[in-house]
């Protein structure tokens, strides 16, 4: 094989070849790139392409309507045109202005949300224009767009394609058009496709209705139709753009932010560029940064009166050219301040000397300049650090276990004290890594010479004890520019940000579905016996907050056989492909669902049973596995929240199933008693020659049920609610009467179609009875309904 190296070695020189290669290199437009890499955007097959195009158009429609505060009405139609399929998606959103229509649909990476940290379905500005690109590549036909805004009586109609060389729209035709809608947008695309992905297409439409209960969705395709009405009139909460969170940014992002900010100080930068950072939090981050950037200073105990160290004399001897009276006062005051402190660092000693010097200058009218102060600090510090072995012994002894003998503790502490004494920096200032080196060297020497072992845990405990004793230095932190120019300093700032306790990011940038609406969406599409939902508090990943939501529907008409049905969503968008590559499924399989009442062979893998499990990840930037946004990436923070949410919902399901088993057991017992009780009552009546017992009343007493019975005397109707149980109950009792009632002051009365509905909501204590009364004239018919109490715990004799 001939190589460039061999040709260059023949003496021909490399310059012509390099120039030739350089001339062949050129940039390409993003449109041209995706023209050759359609699979990256989800257009990797005819079947999937149709689903992807529907998804992109519907996502745009939902976002547009919600941003305008409009309850979405979405119409989707797929027509078989022979060689191609025609896709039409129509919405009732605010419409798009004439100037923006070509750019929105005919230019890739054109959008308003890429830099915004708030939750939206689309963000990059690729989706709908990618569908237009795929349409023109496969059918050669332009996209047809009709859009109308509230401020115009006529709509704007465009036919356009994308110039892949320039990534600019090419308008084939434009005109004003008549459209009956007051506002909205309609797009028609013709493309190659097939309906082999009909299931995924139907799933996408159905799941969109589940996760957007505020939307009305209508769908038509050649063989089927689907319509879902709104389950709520409540729009998702409006989102607000936020700044990144300090716990989520990475080093490259931080360097970019440092370089771009207008702030001079680190405190100003932190407060201006990050969310949840006020003055107090910024101070905490900067102190943590100081520890990493400058190191801490060791705080030593001052000499005690019984020790052979005299700070006052040492300071006095260090002062020159001052009056004896001022010198004595200065030395005495410094010694008194130092002796009163439990421990002090070099920086704290410097502050003491400076404060005392200022006072002495004012009292004695003599100047204690910088040199005098430095000499005094040096002399006093030598006195303080004359013997630090006692401090080191106390720290080592407190950090190690009682199994260490005194000789071992003494050996380690003595050698550690020597490391501080021999330190080049007389201030005993050190970073944590340096302190670890001190401890390791002292421990290694102790093991070698004293035959005493200090393992990893003991060493780390000693490091922690000494580090906690050391104090943060007051040095002025570097400026933003200095940190931006020093990658190591920026890395230390990043560590400080991540180690500081900071409130979770605000959630007003997110629009989670909410627990109530998760259940409403499931109820709209699944006729189940039990529903539960969980919305977790916001967490953060990569500077972006996220919220995880889980819903479970169980029983009812849900299929018993096979695996549970899983619904995956990201920012309210159904994910119908790449299930095996999605973090939501990985975590779901890892939960032991047998603990929560579902079948799961081996305790892992997809559970089976009559259940639907819905998972939703809402974030300002969902981490997808690819540009096609089919699966959520395996991010530890998101996986942790998914696991906790699934387990919490699982516990709700477990409680429900346990309760159902208890009620079933109660039902069987009640059925047995109900079978034998009439015979027992008849026999007892025969033996005692008394009236037969009220079987319903007796059954309620035996089962500790709630008994509701009616008595009618002349015009008075009385409903008695007897609670034979031990706990309070709050039934909703509704009596439907064919005649107009009177005297029902405690009830809510509604007339409908010639019938009167009387509703009470009494609270009845255990062993107590509530009486509900009203008057009615003439012969009336009654029909009673009692809700709020399980059927197994209720007996109605009315």
From Swiss-Prot:
Residues 221-245 are annotated as: Disordered. ATP binds at residues 60, 91, 112-113, 122-129, 629. It catalyses: ATP-dependent breakage, passage and rejoining of double-stranded DNA. SMART domains: HATPase_c (SM00387). Its EC number is 5.6.2.2. Keywords: ATP-binding, DNA-binding, Isomerase, Nucleotide-binding, Topoisomerase. It holds the Pfam family Topo-VIb_trans. Coiled coil: none annotated. Residues 221-233 have a biased composition (Basic and acidic residues). GO terms for biological process: DNA topological change. One of its GO terms (molecular function) is DNA binding. Belongs to the TOP6B family. Relaxes both positive and negative superturns and exhibits a strong decatenase activity. Homodimer. Heterotetramer of two Top6A and two Top6B chains. This is Type 2 DNA topoisomerase 6 subunit B. It comes from Natronomonas pharaonis (strain ATCC 35678 / DSM 2160 / CIP 103997 / JCM 8858 / NBRC 14720 / NCIMB 2260 / Gabara). The gene is top6B.
